Curated annotation (Swiss-Prot):
It comes from the Eukaryota. The keyword Disulfide bond does not apply. Keywords: Apoptosis, Coiled coil, Endoplasmic reticulum, ER-Golgi transport, Host-virus interaction, Membrane, Mitochondrion, Transmembrane, Transmembrane helix, Transport, Ubl conjugation. This is Vesicle transport protein SEC20. Belongs to the SEC20 family. Isoform 1 is highly expressed in heart, brain, liver skeletal muscle and pancreas. Isoform 3 is moderately expressed in placenta, lung and kidney. Isoform 4 is highly expressed in testis and small intestine. One of its GO terms (biological process) is execution phase of apoptosis. GO terms for cellular component: COPI-coated vesicle; cytoplasm; endoplasmic reticulum; endoplasmic reticulum membrane; intracellular membrane-bounded organelle; mitochondrial membrane; mitochondrial outer membrane; nuclear envelope. Residues 1-199 are cytoplasmic. It is a single-pass type IV membrane protein. As part of a SNARE complex may be involved in endoplasmic reticulum membranes fusion and be required for the maintenance of endoplasmic reticulum organization. Also plays a role in apoptosis. It is for instance required for endoplasmic reticulum stress-induced apoptosis. As a substrate of RNF185 interacting with SQSTM1, might also be involved in mitochondrial autophagy. Pfam families: Sec20. Residues 221-228 are lumenal.
């Protein structure tokens, strides 16, 4: 059965290896980082935490090495501690290089964005001028349409006024026709009445004339032929 001290040594070594791999992975992430600067800052914060954990575990392993009873095991563990320290220093150097590479990449990207931003500003200026010209053209077109619609409205009003006048004229003519129709009907009645009266007058004249002739004949008869 392994001694408790050996178990602690094994666990400590495993954690040192784990933190070392995590540091290497974060350093690679920094190499691949193209910005922004806040992303780089976040990665560096994680690297610092892992380095601190790694340093503590190396110190724990060194303390365990010093507590070994056998000199050979002590020296072996101290050699491992030294190797871990060298590896940590190598990781720190790689970390600095990765930061330098990342910062250069970010600077280049920012310069490219500035240049592109100038192009974008020129494009925006051109676009604004084009939009202003288009807006002016659209405004003129709308004003032309508005004038045309106003003319059409005026023509419609004039046509409506003409229709109203024509309708009024027709109504007046209709009233005149009605008045004339009444006058014609009245004239017809008067003519009919006059015709009837004329016939009656003729009949009365004829009767009076007949009566007069009869009277004359009677008088003549009495005078000329008294014996009859």
């Amino acid at each position: 059965m392994a001694a408790p001290q050996d178990v602690h040594v094994r666990i400590c070594n495993q954690e040192i290896v784990k933190f070392d791999l995590e540091v290497k992975a974060l350093i690679q992430d920094i190499r691949d980082c193209s910005g922004p600067l806040s992303a780089l800052t976040e990665l560096n914060t994680k690297v610092k935490e892992k380095f601190q954990q790694l340093r503590h575990r190396i110190q724990d392993l060194e303390q365990l090495a010093k507590e070994q009873d056998k000199e050979s095991e002590k020296q072996l563990l101290l050699q491992e501690v030294e190797n871990h320290k060298k590896q940590m220093l190598s990781n720190q150097a790689s970390w600095r290089k990765a930061n330098l590479t990342c910062k250069i990449a970010i600077d280049n990207l920012e310069k490219a964005e500035l240049l592109q931003g100038g192009d974008l500003l020129r494009q925006r200026k051109t676009t604004k001028e084009s939009l202003a010209q288009t807006s002016s053209t659209i405004t003129e077109s709308l004003m032309g349409i508005s004038r045309m619609m106003a003319q059409q409205v005026q023509q419609s009003e004039e046509a409506m006024q003409s229709l109203v006048t024509s309708s009024r004229t027709i109504l007046d003519a209709n009233e005149e026709f009605k008045s004339m129709s009444g006058t014609i009907q009245l004239g017809r009645k008067l003519i009919t009445k006059y015709n009837r009266r004329e016939l009656t007058d003729k009949l009365l004249i004829f009767l009076a004339l007949a009566l007069f002739l009869a009277t004359v004949l009677y008088i003549v008869k009495k005078r000329l032929f008294p014996f009859l």
